[in-house]
Amino acid sequence: MKNEGKTVILTTHKLKEVMATADRISVMRKGRMIHTIDRSETNERELARLMVGKEVAPERKASARTRGRPLLKVEALEVHADHGRKALDDLELQVHEGEIVGIAGVAGNGQKELAEVLNGLRSWKKGSIVFNGQEIKTASVRHMIEAGVAHVPENRMKSGLAGGLGAVDNLLFKSYRTDKRSRFGFLRTSGNRDWSKSLVEKFDVKTPDIDTPVQQMSGGNQQKLLFAREIDHDPLLMVAVHPTQGLDVGATEGVHRLLTELRDAGRAVLLLSEDLDEVLQLSDRVLVMYNGRIVGEMSGDEADRETIGMYMAGMYGHEDEKLAEEVAG
């Protein structure tokens, strides 16, 4: 279109996209035009700073504390997908207190099913799951919530929030049964509204009113509200699936900060993401899934895109297992 003499206006928060296509770039923040610059005179880091209003540090932030005991132990787990195919095959992993474990892998290699199992949404055929010293026998969402597992799902509006309801109702989903939120089966309306307002303020959720349907919020504010609910429940383990998908630079930085704060407070974080930059930036340990198994493990300091990519493609780990099986046979 440009070569035909037409003018193209591209609106996006994806920095790689704008750097690959635009001739001039204008940055908007909070409804105002902040800056306009030729693409040849800028870079992604400067654009990120203009979008957020401050410097965005992309380097990995290591934990300042020693990791604690194993909080989650998964051994020889076998899970079938909806259509009957084996989604997890003899999967084993551990997540310790005070660490972020990032799981990388091409979509469709069992990440979805793993997250569902850990949140009580899917049952398993074989294997064991030990959480906080107790073996989990059957899948139950309520049991996993009460045990201390928080969940940020891949699709926040499909599985995490009720779009037609406001902040108050969405924040109550996990805690409405507790004595703080209800009494004799009736919600503590006044107290719950005050509590909701405090969480909206604490997590910097931008909304006209706590009763405004969350579907009218931006994606970043929806995600902050979801994190507010999950973190307020004081979880031991956070299972975060593609937590920054569709978010702009500022909202992404905010989500990353929340995850690292959980880790630094001694909580465990299991991060499932297809964004390798995100996995590399946040993870203390990196695991790679392929064909329903963990085929690679490395520390956050040792991990690099090339090695992870080879594992994701099945070029490492998987062939070694096949060779070992052939020798044993």
Which sequence ranges carry the predicted segments?
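Glycine-rich phosphate-binding loops of nucleotide-dependent enzymes
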Residues: 1-329
